[in-house]
Amino acid sequence: MGHEQNQGAALLQMLPLLWLLPHSWAVPEAPTPMWPDDLQNHTFLHTVYCQDGSPSVGLSEAYDEDQLFFFDFSQNTRVPRLPEFADWAQEQGDAPAILFDKEFCEWMIQQIGPKLDGKIPVSRGFPIAEVFTLKPLEFGKPNTLVCFVSNLFPPMLTVNWQHHSVPVEGFGPTFVSAVDGLSFQAFSYLNFTPEPSDIFSCIVTHEIDRYTAIAYWVPRNALPSDLLENVLCGVAFGLGVLGIIVGIVLIIYFRKPCSGD
């Protein structure tokens, strides 16, 4: 009897939170609007999350699953994923609302989390990592390696880089963003100048279960920039000479007098 009363008390404490649920949970779904054929639907995700782990709180904003910003709660400011978004990141008019969401999320973890512990299945996603270059590969020219992490849940991870099995320093922060289906993805960037002998590895550790995913990168299908320029010049020169020869042959052919019967 006492156990049932405790469960009932826990449910009563959750009743004031029902107003926070999305309206689609409480009312029938509205009819789908009929948009003109030349219009497209887009999705902007503003996702605040908190957890008993690192990072303890986070905010990501994405447009059609392409991350635009994350929020640095230590500085109370947006951080753009790409430099092109820096001007938009200066807008801080919604900072009080973001801080309220943070405090409310942390309160939910503290007050309601223990009551639901053991009653809700724990979801886990084993992260999948892959590494690629941001620009076409040319030896000797600065480029950026991108470590893309998918199937991430919960978003507790550590990303490290190695070059020939030696730890690399100086890489940028890890950007975590939410995607459809309440899962997450992450990006880590490393600036480098590629060489033919390079071997890089991106090591992703899922903090909640210490699962580690490793993705390797080695140069493939690349030509040194000097050789590439020489090859392109040679091809262009060859095509030019061929065009001249074909032109001369056609001129001679059409100016040749026709033989009579």
UniProtKB/Swiss-Prot annotation:
<dbReference type="InterPro" id="IPR001003">
    <property type="entry name" value="MHC_II_a_N"/>
</dbReference>
<keyword id="KW-0732">Signal</keyword>
<dbReference type="GO" id="GO:0002250">
    <property type="term" value="P:adaptive immune response"/>
</dbReference>
<keyword id="KW-0491">MHC II</keyword>
<feature type="signal peptide">
    <location>
        <begin position="1"/>
        <end position="26"/>
    </location>
</feature>
<dbReference type="InterPro" id="IPR011162">
    <property type="entry name" value="MHC_I/II-like_Ag-recog"/>
</dbReference>
<dbReference type="InterPro" id="IPR003006">
    <property type="entry name" value="Ig/MHC_CS"/>
</dbReference>
<keyword id="KW-1133">Transmembrane helix</keyword>
<keyword id="KW-0458">Lysosome</keyword>
<dbReference type="GO" id="GO:0009986">
    <property type="term" value="C:cell surface"/>
</dbReference>
<dbReference type="GO" id="GO:0050870">
    <property type="term" value="P:positive regulation of T cell activation"/>
</dbReference>
<dbReference type="InterPro" id="IPR013783">
    <property type="entry name" value="Ig-like_fold"/>
</dbReference>
<dbReference type="InterPro" id="IPR050160">
    <property type="entry name" value="MHC/Immunoglobulin"/>
</dbReference>
<dbReference type="GO" id="GO:0016020">
    <property type="term" value="C:membrane"/>
</dbReference>
<dbReference type="InterPro" id="IPR036179">
    <property type="entry name" value="Ig-like_dom_sf"/>
</dbReference>
<keyword id="KW-0472">Membrane</keyword>
<feature type="transmembrane region" description="Helical">
    <location>
        <begin position="234"/>
        <end position="254"/>
    </location>
</feature>
<feature type="disulfide bond">
    <location>
        <begin position="147"/>
        <end position="202"/>
    </location>
</feature>
<feature type="disulfide bond">
    <location>
        <begin position="50"/>
        <end position="105"/>
    </location>
</feature>
<keyword id="KW-1064">Adaptive immunity</keyword>
<dbReference type="InterPro" id="IPR014745">
    <property type="entry name" value="MHC_II_a/b_N"/>
</dbReference>
<dbReference type="GO" id="GO:0023026">
    <property type="term" value="F:MHC class II protein complex binding"/>
</dbReference>
<feature type="topological domain" description="Cytoplasmic">
    <location>
        <begin position="255"/>
        <end position="261"/>
    </location>
</feature>
<dbReference type="GO" id="GO:0043231">
    <property type="term" value="C:intracellular membrane-bounded organelle"/>
</dbReference>
<dbReference type="InterPro" id="IPR007110">
    <property type="entry name" value="Ig-like_dom"/>
</dbReference>
<keyword id="KW-0812">Transmembrane</keyword>
<dbReference type="GO" id="GO:0002503">
    <property type="term" value="P:peptide antigen assembly with MHC class II protein complex"/>
</dbReference>
<dbReference type="GO" id="GO:0019886">
    <property type="term" value="P:antigen processing and presentation of exogenous peptide antigen via MHC class II"/>
</dbReference>
<feature type="glycosylation site" description="N-linked (GlcNAc...) asparagine">
    <location>
        <position position="41"/>
    </location>
</feature>
<keyword id="KW-0391">Immunity</keyword>
<feature type="region of interest" description="Alpha-1">
    <location>
        <begin position="27"/>
        <end position="124"/>
    </location>
</feature>
<keyword id="KW-0325">Glycoprotein</keyword>
<dbReference type="GO" id="GO:0050778">
    <property type="term" value="P:positive regulation of immune response"/>
</dbReference>
<feature type="region of interest" description="Connecting peptide">
    <location>
        <begin position="218"/>
        <end position="233"/>
    </location>
</feature>
<dbReference type="GO" id="GO:0005765">
    <property type="term" value="C:lysosomal membrane"/>
</dbReference>
<feature type="domain" description="Ig-like C1-type">
    <location>
        <begin position="121"/>
        <end position="215"/>
    </location>
</feature>
<dbReference type="InterPro" id="IPR003597">
    <property type="entry name" value="Ig_C1-set"/>
</dbReference>
<comment type="function">
    <text>Plays a critical role in catalyzing the release of class II-associated invariant chain peptide (CLIP) from newly synthesized MHC class II molecules and freeing the peptide binding site for acquisition of antigenic peptides. In B-cells, the interaction between HLA-DM and MHC class II molecules is regulated by HLA-DO.</text>
</comment>
<dbReference type="GO" id="GO:0042613">
    <property type="term" value="C:MHC class II protein complex"/>
</dbReference>
<feature type="topological domain" description="Lumenal">
    <location>
        <begin position="27"/>
        <end position="233"/>
    </location>
</feature>
<dbReference type="GO" id="GO:0031902">
    <property type="term" value="C:late endosome membrane"/>
</dbReference>
<feature type="region of interest" description="Alpha-2">
    <location>
        <begin position="125"/>
        <end position="217"/>
    </location>
</feature>
